[in-house]
């Protein structure tokens, strides 16, 4: 009782076509298709970039990690010790 038959879907489609018109539906379909295509191309480009990054990661794995210090960073423990002592 909760599922719709094919006739229900056809009637809904007919009402949608009457409300929006076939031209607007065609535009929506082409916009959706181009969005999916763009998404797939972006995913493909992302997977092509990934192997290049993994090679850099392998080269950096042999080197010890460097500590980055920022002049605006405050070491909280050192500040607390200086206040106490």
From Swiss-Prot:
GO CC, sorted alphabetically, is: TAT protein transport complex
Q: Which GO terms describe its biological process?
A: protein transport by the Tat complex
What is the membrane topology here? Single-pass membrane protein
Record family assignment: Belongs to the TatA/E family.
Quaternary structure? The Tat system comprises two distinct complexes: a TatABC complex, containing multiple copies of TatA, TatB and TatC subunits, and a separate TatA complex, containing only TatA subunits. Substrates initially bind to the TatABC complex, which probably triggers association of the separate TatA complex to form the active translocon.
Enumerate the NCBIfam families for this protein: PRK02958.1, tatAE
What's the name of the protein? Answer: Sec-independent protein translocase protein TatA
Q: Which species does the entry assign this protein to?
A: Ralstonia nicotianae (strain ATCC BAA-1114 / GMI1000) (Ralstonia solanacearum)
């Amino acid at each position: 009782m909760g599922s719709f038959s094919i006739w229900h879907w056809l009637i809904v489609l007919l009402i949608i076509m009457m409300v929006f018109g076939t031209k607007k539906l065609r535009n929506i379909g082409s916009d959706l298709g181009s969005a999916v295509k763009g998404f797939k191309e972006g995913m493909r480009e992302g997977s092509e970039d990934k192997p290049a990054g993994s090679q850099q990661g392998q080269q950096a794995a042999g080197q010890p990690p460097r500590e980055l210090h920022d002049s605006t960073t405050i070491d909280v423990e050192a500040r607390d010790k200086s206040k106490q002592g």
